[in-house]
Swiss-Prot record:
GO terms for molecular function: structural constituent of ribosome. Residues 86-123 are annotated as: Disordered. This is Small ribosomal subunit protein bS16. GO terms for biological process: translation. Residues 93-102, 114-123 have a biased composition (Low complexity). InterPro entries: Ribosomal_bS16, Ribosomal_bS16_CS, Ribosomal_bS16_dom_sf. Residues 104-113 have a biased composition (Basic and acidic residues). Keywords: Ribonucleoprotein, Ribosomal protein. Gene3D superfamilies: 3.30.1320.10. The gene is rpsP. Belongs to the bacterial ribosomal protein bS16 family. Pfam families: Ribosomal_S16.
């Protein structure tokens, strides 16, 4: 049985409240779970101690027997020191312009440098 540590939504409309639960990966998000290990109340301010309540011993136990936390909980557990902080891969290609645009920018920079040199020599 594949186990997940995930958030199960509760609360009213526009007033979310989450239970941190250990559940079978095939179970519905808000459905049957094995154990409740904490709560998360996003309506409270970030510095409030009641925003995240966690039974760290039980989380460590479930992680040791192979339960996989969701991405959101991995970030939270990393802040608490329960798991290693996930490594984010750098995006190397996406932010760079295409080759033609890079060539155009390089040519424009050369023209600007030549114009600046001419202006400096003319003074």
């Amino acid at each position: 049985m594949a186990l997940k540590i995930r958030l199960s939504r509760g609360g009213a409309k526009k007033r979310p409240f989450y239970k941190i639960v250990v559940a079978d990966a095939r179970a519905p998000r808000d459905g049957r779970f094995i154990e409740k290990v904490g709560t998360y109340n996003p309506m409270l301010p970030n510095d409030n101690g009641q925003r995240w309540i966690l039974d760290e011993d039980r989380v460590k136990h479930w992680l040791s027997v192979g339960a996989q936390p969701t991405d959101r909980l991995v970030r939270f557990f990393a802040d608490k020191g329960l798991v290693a902080k996930p490594v984010r891969a750098e995006q190397t290609k996406q932010p760079q312009p295409k080759a033609k645009a890079q060539q155009r920018a390089k040519d424009q920079a050369e023209r600007d440098a030549a114009a600046a040199a001419e202006a400096a020599a003319g003074e």
